[in-house]
Amino acid sequence: MRLNIPTKPEDALWTDDQWKAIQANGNNILVAAAAGSGKTAVLVTRIIEKLINETENLNVDELLIVTFTNVSAAEMKYRIGKSLEEALVQNPESVHLKKQVALLNYASISTLHSFCLEIIRKHYFEADIDPNFRLIEPIESSMIRDEVLEDLLEKEYSIENNEGFFHLVESFTGDRSDAELHTLISKLYDFSRANPNPDLWLEQMVSFYDTQAITSITELPYFPIIKEDIQLRINQAKSYLLTAIDYANENNGPAPYLSTLENDLAQINTLSSISWDNWQDVKFGFESIDFKRIPALKNKADFDEEYVEEAKKFRDAAKKEVKNVLIDWFSREEENYLSDLEKMKPDIKTLSELVKKFAENFFEEKQQRGVLDFNDLEHLALKILLKNGAPSDVANSYKKQFKEVLIDEYQDTNMVQETILLLVTNSNDTKGNLFMVGDVKQSIYRFRLAEPTLFMAKYQEYQQDGEGSGIRIDLSQNFRSRKEVLDATNFIFHQLMDKHIAEIDYDEAAELTLGASFPEANNMATELLLIDMKSEEKESEDELSPQELQKNQVESRAIATKIREMIDNKFPIYDKKLQQNRPIQYRDIVILARAMTSAPDMEEAMKIKDIPFYANNNSGYFETTEVATMIALMKVIDNPYQDISLAAVLRSPIIGLNEEELGQIRMAKKKGYFFDAMLAYKDITVSDAANKISRFITQLNNWRELSIRENLTALIWQIYQETNFYEFVGGLPGGKQRQANLRALYDRANQYEKTSFRGLFRFVRFVERLEVRGDDLGTAKTLGEKEDVVRMMTIHASKGLEFPVVIVSGLSRKFNMRDIYSKTLLDKDYGFASNYRDIEKMIVYPTIMQQAIKQKKYREMIAEEMRVLYVALTRAEEKLILTATVPDFEKTSKNWLQVSNQQETILPAAIRAKAKCYLDWIGNATIRHSHFKELLCEEKIKTLPTDMKLQVEIKTKEMFLTDDLEKEKSDNWMENVKAHKQVPVKSPYKDEIERFMHYQYKDEEATGIRAKQSVTELKRQFSLQDSWSDTSILKEFQKVSLDRPKFLQQNKLSATEIGTAMHTLMQAVPLDDKPTEKDLVSLLQLMREKDILTEAQIKAINVNQIIAFFESALGKTVLQKKDKVKREVPFSYLLPAAKLYNQTNLDEHVLIQGVVDSMIEEEDSIILIDYKTDKIEGRYDNWEAAEKVMKERYQIQIKLYAEAIQAISRKKVSHAYLYFFDGQHICQINIEEGI
């Protein structure tokens, strides 16, 4: 269609694209507005132009304007109102304008949640809900959710023959609790609610496990993900080998390697032409890769050692890529991968039904309480707007009402919100009325289930000329930042973003162009500050060796140093209001971070440099001493029989007891609750501590009565008044903040009591749940937004904001991969994926679906993190500083040099996709800048043409320890150390510290006793001596026996590993008849197919030794009494430590754990049999000599077995035998003597 755009006035300040966005009509419009492009101004102007144009006869209440936040909605309404009033001043007689001012308060300018709430309140009867509902906060909703879910699971447990549910519990939970299932149901519920039809989404989730009609992995719906991942790894292996070949071709490079490397590359290239129609062909292709041994270099001195090592390193990396493909995608047979999914289908169906039941019960419970939560708003609005799959009468009325629907931040919309918006617009007509503004490069809310693909689909579908289903307008001109900031952003993201990795191309339409005007300046180059954490090899003899500071601490000090330099040097900042430069102020600087974990270190570093600092941190509230003390006191008031909370209160300033007095309380009553011990101490002791306790008990009783009579806030205020705790914390360091935290506790208790929950017990439980979930509330704010301080905030919190100087910190912080590597994965397209747990064998396998979804989620995470970085870099107006630590700059820069010969602007996909942190991207991008090339003196680097001004600084961590060293020198600290003199102590706690240091623990012997010990470990320890009394055993208890690493297990199996294999086979041999060699070989083959034993283990097993056992008298007895035989019997047995150590003063116990190989359980007695794989033949002269050694070695183990089994079964162990496979010897152990 032809765009009828009015001619732009000559004096208009708008760009052509902005003018087009303001004036375009006649179809759906998507405005792709880059960072700083003035999208909000364009959106407001478009609305105002429509309203003041009386020929359009458009009223403000005929527009639906949807914003992302309530703040944005309020600002939008303010701007529109102000513009209307200004227009009315110009045309005071306009009835139309007066009408718009009057209607403004009734206009639909809000978040989508608010619009949904408006729909529900007007049409509640269509949703069949009580019109007097109350909208609850997420915290109250989560509490109701927990109660409903606990009730649901309890009911499921109580249903008889509920086999499907119990199998699900066994498959997806641990041994100790069903907390994992609780979390899983809750997550699935949340995820399903991001879909217009949650029940349908859950049913589709089950369908992905139906593989009966599927004959090959290539037919799976997510096979393209698998294929793409494998191809990416093939390309990465190629890249590694090409880099290795480059090193081999260097002067003095390892040229003898070339033939092998080129052969490797040829093999990898064959994989590019592999047929993807047959999974077995793909598998065969990778299994056929044979990396030959690299030739030895005869005259090593002729070759550059660095080139040799780098060539080897990159070849090894290529080999690892191929190996990982085999591990990740071909570790199991194709039919096993498919059958695993089919076996899981019943569990997934049960899980799906559970989530549906929970959703129904949860909504019913909220209805009974007369409340709704934010999730309900969208789905109830959808229920009202959609009837039988078509727009309802209500939806059609909104379509008639709204002449245009305008959406801000469209890139953060999800599927439910999209469906709602489409139901109230004419978007499906030939003349749509949907106006969407956003920037998909700034879509950073996928964790809130935002769906950026909605934006991208329209971006690709809509045309700039208006033909087709919509109009696309690109706003790329940036009116926020200096050219230096824009050049840096473009230089980096031209190399990073494309549709393949970032889900969008960073092309000419997407790049930022200069729109703002700043005076020329020479010091605005983008800075990359890297701190090398590698310690200097030699320290100055007259200085203390620097302490090993954590990365966050060093980087924080480097940033503080940089800020102090800028402040001291009066770094110039352009003031847009004054239209001239002025010296930089603290408020001009913001530090951005992906997370706030480094905030405490940053605060400490700023204190050192005397820089006022404020961190917008939403965590740490419950950890503050004053709040933790109050929470502990409330727990004690609710239930005084809570030892830890009671001890915390007694030790706190509220009561003021010390550790020694707490110890005396416990001695007053050694066993039982600490509260009872406190009462006993009060009654038998006359002391200051007893007086404090008496007063506390009186107060406690009063508070307990008050908690019943009054509300929670009255109780908290009474505690503040009676104890003077509020005044006390005000006198401590940071007293203003501490008092603000206590006031916040009072306020939050007040908010809590406005919910549907009441009482102290529920509040305490509510706080405990917040702590367990990590839903901290953040310390109270004591600083205003306008104060002159350096601010630190997350990148997410900075979205939509701008600052003169931006320091993007923590670029080497690893991406959060926790969700990707969790046991269960959720995906909008494929539902739910997890491991397959074989309950009978107790073996867990990764499923092909889990592997595929993991790769999909990883790629989505990489794309999201790339967009987060884009948001961070585009916050800067004038100066951009990037900071990171590197473990060893020399090695790190060599890794970046892998792209030095890259011809294309875009970096290789594999390098971008495998990034572990932002620095992996920034390092590989900036190393192709001429400044970096000069810094490294690397002529082979192929630089990219750019206007970007870059300044790279490499600092050592020792540079930021000066403050500590100067302080130490001022205290004559080093001089005293060198003179072997006592270091002066200025602490007021000197005496108390010395008392701590000289404290002697009276039960020191008990510290050497483990609470739990295996019989095997005890046997090994006791083989060192003949009695239990030797105290050298204590040291043995501290030793840890570790399994051999995987790379060592590839060699010959150890004796222990062979023994494990023999025991595993003995556990599986059928006892119906004496096994033959054929029987055992078949059994071993089956165990290999089911991954119970490895090929190496099977080869180590001598089946003739197994046959010989069943031919022995002991073996025949086992076969004869097969119905009474139990194998691999685990047990736990509590044994007095005094018995083990022969020390009567030990009042401790040791939990002994072990597994009996085999036992024959008669009616009144038991025979124990333990199999041994010790080497006998050829090691001892005769069996008598061997028997003596074996009895000494194993008698403790067998006696412990016997004592434990007798105590547990209450049957006498009549006989105990050791059977040695080597030589077929039977050894009877005398158990009558006991231990």
UniProtKB/Swiss-Prot annotation:
Heterodimer of AddA and AddB/RexB. It comes from the Bacteria. This is ATP-dependent helicase/nuclease subunit A. Residues 12-482 form the UvrD-like helicase ATP-binding domain. Keywords: ATP-binding, DNA damage, DNA repair, DNA-binding, Exonuclease, Helicase, Hydrolase, Isomerase, Nuclease, Nucleotide-binding. Its EC number is 3.1.-.-, 5.6.2.4. HAMAP family: AddA. Belongs to the helicase family. AddA subfamily. ATP binds at residues 33-40. It catalyses: Couples ATP hydrolysis with the unwinding of duplex DNA by translocating in the 3'-5' direction; ATP + H2O = ADP + phosphate + H(+). Its cofactor is Mg(2+).
